[in-house]
Amino acid sequence: MLTADDKKLIQQIWEKVGSHLEDFGAEALERMFITYPQTKTYFPHFDLHPGSEQIRGHGKKVANALGNAVKSLDNLSQALSELSNLHAYNLRVDPVNFKLLSQCFQVVLAVHMGKDYTPEVHAAYDKFLTAVAAVLAEKYR
């Protein structure tokens, strides 16, 4: 459960992400593909080289979806419903992969936010990304 303080920290950091959506999303995907190579199986049609247009494009989609979730912190299920349906019913992505990508996104934030990525921010984003992963996995039950 996100507290009012968590929500405030999440929104403050997300404002700083702003113009870096595509970069951060792509970097998170690249980190996931390197750290968890089994995740590449869901992208057989992608050029998986770092910086490829396909990774950058999908990274932007990921970051935009997270941005949408940040705007809807009080109703993540509704905000992510279509995305959950897509991944569960059409793409059939193993839901464990949402957690893996969340971890990689945390690393990207920590690297780029520097001293602004305090332990409190880390904890808030951990709760937020865990909630996002749980919502995306809801349709699998």
From Swiss-Prot:
Q: Name one GO molecular function term.
A: organic acid binding
Species of origin reads Struthio camelus
Provide the gene name from the record: HBAD
Q: How does it assemble?
A: Heterotetramer of two alpha-D chains and two beta chains.
Task: Please give the name of this protein.
Answer: Hemoglobin subunit alpha-D
Positions with a binding annotation for heme b: 58, 87
> Does this entry carry the keyword DNA damage?
no
Q: What is the lineage of its organism?
A: Eukaryota, Metazoa, Chordata, Craniata, Vertebrata
- All copies of the Globin domain together span 1-141
Tell me where on the tree of life, at the top rank, the source sits.
Eukaryota
